[in-house]
Amino acid sequence: MRDFDKRLEKAIERGQRAGNLRAEAEAQKALSERELRRRHTDYRLKLSEHIEGCLRQIPDHLPGFRFDSIVSERGWGAAASRDDVELRRGQKPVTLFSRLEMLIRPLAESYVLELSAKATVRNRERFRRTHYQRLADVDLESFTGLIDLWVLEFAELYAAKS
């Protein structure tokens, strides 16, 4: 019986250790979730400011564009857009829409930082892009570089079509 008592006590101790380890892991996971949320907020603020700074310059260089900040359930960012009317002899006027929208998406369960962009030039979608990285591995320079690149590409596409 003594042997069984010892084995029973060891089994109980192993169970308690496993329970303690599981509780510690859950506490660590909650802490890391909090940290990931904090990081997402920090990155979102920095990148949405960069997006606004870049898109705010489009109306200065391409007259007729309007700048709009975006804060919605779809994300945080900005858009630059304009409407043109094309008049052709003997035809109805055609409204032409151009817009560049860039957003940092809300935090998802996958814990990634996601940048999305959609560009339309004269009623034709020119690109729709998404770039994301895990929050633990974010390289802000790659995001700001893509924002700059996509804004420049949109300006070039618009200038070529107008």
Where in this protein do the model-derived segments appear?
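Terminal, compositionally biased segments
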Residues: M1-A23, S162
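Intrinsically disordered, low-complexity regulatory segments enriched in Ser/Thr/Pro
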Residues: M1-K10, S81-S142
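Contiguous, amphipathic alpha-helical segments that mediate oligomerization or scaffolding
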Residues: R14, A18-R66
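Conserved N-terminal glycine/acidic-rich loop preference
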Residues: R22-A23, A27-L31, A78-Q91
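Long, charged, glycine-rich C-terminal linkers/tails
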Residues: H61-S81
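Terminal low-complexity "docking" segments
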Residues: S142-L146, V151-S162
